[in-house]
């Protein structure tokens, strides 16, 4: 292909300087005023590359051996002058180099005058050349055509339709713009079809039939809904009945908790400090603890971490003291009741000599969660062990963390808030009626359960407490005794 254009190139340059034209010869053309400025541009044989690309293309080495007048595009000064002249006035030829002479109509190469050479009307069919989206690319015409087969005004300095020279321009066939569409290039030759396939164009989205890949709509049968039995609506309970049911469930839960505490602590009359996790069955022991520096340091730690005021901390201390007084009163009442003692279960019930069991006194270590025999040697051996030294430090930090949680939970209780308001007014907030006392007990036991659930994730028994898992009986926990734990009936 390039060889033929190379031989024709010499002929066109000779005719450029020798041939003359007249107005009569150009009178038959509809756009004859453009005739004198048209000339076959040798640049079309380069392959239609962009003028701003390198001068050496894919087929330049072949053109240099077969009749091409110029070894390089910009070496000959005469060629450069011709290129500059045609680039300013005409813009070069718009013939596509991908079409060989065998595909061109008869008479094109014959010297029949300027009229047949310059008119593009016979070549404006969409079956001859593919429509282009952008021009001046590889294999593309130098400038787009208009509706009548001639060149567009863009080639002669007219207004541009796209952004920049020769970009974003669309072909027009018959005066109708068809953006993104190209002619039927299936009838073109192999080279032309290859060029047309490289043209960017909008592709229509593939048609997806409904129901092939998507979900099919479930069709319900007319009589299917009639066979289904509709469950009867649940009876709506009144607010009083719902409240009564919740109260009964809460009391049953409290009863089970009291039984569990009774099995754990014996008579359930242990004196506890919820902040320090201190437990004692002696009144004197709890009194000494409440007045000790350990208890005061714990209150200072809570105030420092929670930023509570001094009256708040005094109120929390009074709550612990009030709990101690309640426990002492219930304990005195239970000791006076002989019937309660008769109903007390015997610890050794069902134990026979063959079981080889005996009742002994033990010492419980809350830091290690182990039971140590109540012997001097056993207690001293446990105190000097490495496990106890590690566990007591970790347990102390755990108590500090849980004390903050306990204090915050107590103050968030609505009943405690009401008592705190009375305390600020100078009244005694702990004198309550029997009904209020029952409600207080329910609130306190609910709070106890929440605190125990919150303290479970913070207990670390993996490495620091290896003996606790093996020695502590299942279900026992002496480390979480909230402020409001009571055993009132």
UniProtKB/Swiss-Prot annotation:
Q: What are the annotated GO cellular component locations? A: DBIRD complex; nucleus
| Keywords carried by this UniProt record | DNA-binding, Metal-binding, mRNA processing, mRNA splicing, Nucleus, Repeat, Zinc, Zinc-finger
One GO molecular-function entry: RNA polymerase II complex binding
Residue ranges with Basic and acidic residues bias = 62-76
Region entry Disordered, spans:
1-28, 62-100, 133-181, 205-263, 431-489
- InterPro entries membership: AKAP95, ZF_C2H2_AKAP95
- Record's compositionally biased regions (Acidic residues): 433-451
Which spans does this entry mark as compositional bias, Polar residues?
7-22, 91-100
Q: Which is a GO BP term held by this UniProt record?
A: mRNA processing
> Where on this chain are zinc fingers (C2H2 AKAP95-type) annotated?
273-295, 365-388
UniProt keyword annotation of Zinc-finger present = yes
Motif, Bipartite nuclear localization signal: chain positions: 200-221
So which domain of life are we looking at?
Answer: Eukaryota
Chief subcellular location: nucleus
Q: What does this protein do?
A: Core component of the DBIRD complex, a multiprotein complex that acts at the interface between core mRNP particles and RNA polymerase II (RNAPII) and integrates transcript elongation with the regulation of alternative splicing.
- Please give the family membership noted in the entry: Belongs to the AKAP95 family.
Q: Identify this protein by name.
A: DBIRD complex subunit ZNF326
Give the species: Xenopus tropicalis
Gene name for this UniProt entry: znf326
